[in-house]
Amino acid sequence: PVVEEKKQSNQKKETQPSPQSEKSDEEYDVAVLGSGPGGYTAAFRAADLGLKVVLIERYTTIGGVCLNVGCIPSKALLHTAKVITDAEDTASHGVSFSQPKIDLDQLRNWKSNKVVKKLTMGLAQMAKQREVKVIEGEGKFASPNQINVKLNDGAKKTIGFKSAIIAAG
């Protein structure tokens, strides 16, 4: 179904249960499976349109592979390599530096706790501001309007929805 843009309102509309085979633990207008760039963008936009949204992610932080272990961490390390190369290149300008000492543990800590963590915490805050419910667990469709989620703590939850977006990479 096509989501039509509604007038901005601070009130979320009431969500009615959708047709399903068993009772859901929670009901949403939109369920998004996967919290990478496509998933969180879709979830945030749906929430901005006034829909009640749940974002289901198997890992403990939103942002997907790109943000957590792929593109962003790799680019952070590449940036450090470029800084070293740029410093070496200044010798032609008459400025030279001693050979850098690389502390891999500190470099990894910077990448994980300064770069990646800052971005994932920003996304979590944006989800909270938009009242997007984030559920940590693995979701599988149980019916056309339900997803069974095995939560990361081992519990199970059934999510009812009107529309779903699969953004699992």
Listing of model-derived features with the role each one plays in the protein:
Residues 1-3, 35:
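Mobile cofactor-carrier "swinging-arm" domains
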Residues 4-22, 26-28, 44-51, 57-169:
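Glycine-rich flavin
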Residues 34-37, 60:
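Glycine-rich Rossmann-fold phosphate-binding loop(s) that bind the pyrophosphate
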Residues 40:
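Residues forming the Rossmann-fold NAD(P)(H) cofactor-binding site
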